[in-house]
Amino acid sequence: MMQKQNMIVVNQKEIAKNIYELVLQGTLVQQMNEPGQFVHIKVAEGIAPLLRRPISICNVDQEKNEFTMLYRAEGQGTKTLATRKQGEMVDVLGPLGHGFPLEEAEAGQTALLVGGGIGVPPLYELSQRLVAKGVRVIHILGFQTKDVVFYEEKFAELGDTYVATVDGTHGTKGFVTDVIDNYGIDFDILYSCGPLAMLRALEGRYKEKKAYISLEERMGCGIGACFACVCHLQEDPSGHSYKKVCSDGPVFPIGEVVL
């Protein structure tokens, strides 16, 4: 159930170049039961920036009423958020959207989790949930360069983890698909979040597989009212049918929406 709450900053730190880990505390965490959902953050107390910022949920600790977000500080809004200190309050709306379907993966199966850049964070909570139900997980994390790699060790604690960097400064040189090819990775179900180019490459390979992708889109309202994040359906070539990333997604079965 979506709620709005002022949550307290437990901790915030930079964990890679311009990548921040923010831990917030509040009873809203009790509503976070679906990995892959996101929250909308009001980054400042004044009018500007006007729009909330959508940030995925990386980790949930309901015993402590805490959840973790990872985000890249690159625009005015997220740079402002990066200045928040322990004990300050942050206005949070969420949880929003439909997350990854855990029920599609069965105990004993292998799930491949593929993340690119700031699309990596929601896969961490997903991986923990899958491991808890007896699913074997394999992670492939793609980044531009070594300086922006994060959470490699945390993912490695849950299952086999591979890293690809475009410039080859860490892990496999190239893209996540190069890792799949180099290591002959096979799987029963695929979950992925990242840039459109990466998702298109995976869709081209695995249309016949059981696979789910999470779309990174700029959003306005976050609740399906403003129509700023619509995407068209592949089954309708006329382009008249669409779904909204924020409320119908952000997770969709692979092949359902036009990338």
Curated annotation (Swiss-Prot):
Cofactor comment text: Binds 1 [2Fe-2S] cluster per subunit. Binds 1 FAD per subunit.
Which residues of this UniProt protein bind [2Fe-2S] cluster? 221, 226, 229, 246
Keyword Nucleotide-binding tagged: no
Q: Which cofactor does it need?
A: [2Fe-2S] cluster; FAD
Pathway listed for it is: Pyrimidine metabolism; UMP biosynthesis via de novo pathway; orotate from (S)-dihydroorotate (NAD(+) route): step 1/1
* Entry superkingdom: Bacteria
Question: Sorted alphabetically, which keywords does the UniProt record give?
Answer: 2Fe-2S, Electron transport, FAD, Flavoprotein, Iron, Iron-sulfur, Metal-binding, Pyrimidine biosynthesis, Transport
Q: Which GO terms describe its molecular function?
A: 2 iron, 2 sulfur cluster binding; electron transfer activity; flavin adenine dinucleotide binding; metal ion binding; oxidoreductase activity
A Pfam family cross-referenced in the UniProt record is NAD_binding_1
Q: Does the record bear Iron in its keywords?
A: yes
Q: Which residues make up the binding site for FAD?
A: 53-56, 70-72, 77-78
- Gene Ontology BP annotations: 'de novo' UMP biosynthetic process
User: What range(s) does the FAD-binding FR-type domain occupy?
Assistant: 2-102
Q: How does it assemble?
A: Heterotetramer of 2 PyrK and 2 PyrD type B subunits.
What biological function has been recorded for the protein in this entry? Answer: Responsible for channeling the electrons from the oxidation of dihydroorotate from the FMN redox center in the PyrD type B subunit to the ultimate electron acceptor NAD(+).
* Name of the molecule in the record: Dihydroorotate dehydrogenase B (NAD(+)), electron transfer subunit
Organism of origin is Bacillus cereus (strain B4264)
Q: What is the lineage of its organism?
A: Bacteria, Bacillati, Bacillota, Bacilli, Bacillales
